[in-house]
């Protein structure tokens, strides 16, 4: 399985993986409105052995098969003093 990865031009560190190159038709309108425009980054073969920096390959493959896209959001950063510890 191949994925086509696009970077949001509006939201830093936000990427969309598509099952078909340039086919944003399966991406919800709300998501497109918040993240578009997109720029193509790369094509990647999603083999079980493949490692991705911030996503699990099996999860990405499942989402592409079901929905035609996978949305990778930036990791949440927690700064010291922002968490309550019991």
Swiss-Prot record:
Which ranges carry the YcgL domain? 1-83
Entry-linked Pfam families: YcgL
Q: Which Gene3D superfamilies match?
A: YcgL domain (3.10.510.20)
- Tell me where on the tree of life, at the top rank, the source sits: Bacteria
Q: Could you tell me which InterPro entries the record lists for this protein? A: YcgL-like_sf, YcgL_dom
Membrane-spanning residues where? none
Q: What is this protein called?
A: YcgL domain-containing protein XOO0464
Organism whose genome encodes this protein: Xanthomonas oryzae pv. oryzae (strain KACC10331 / KXO85)
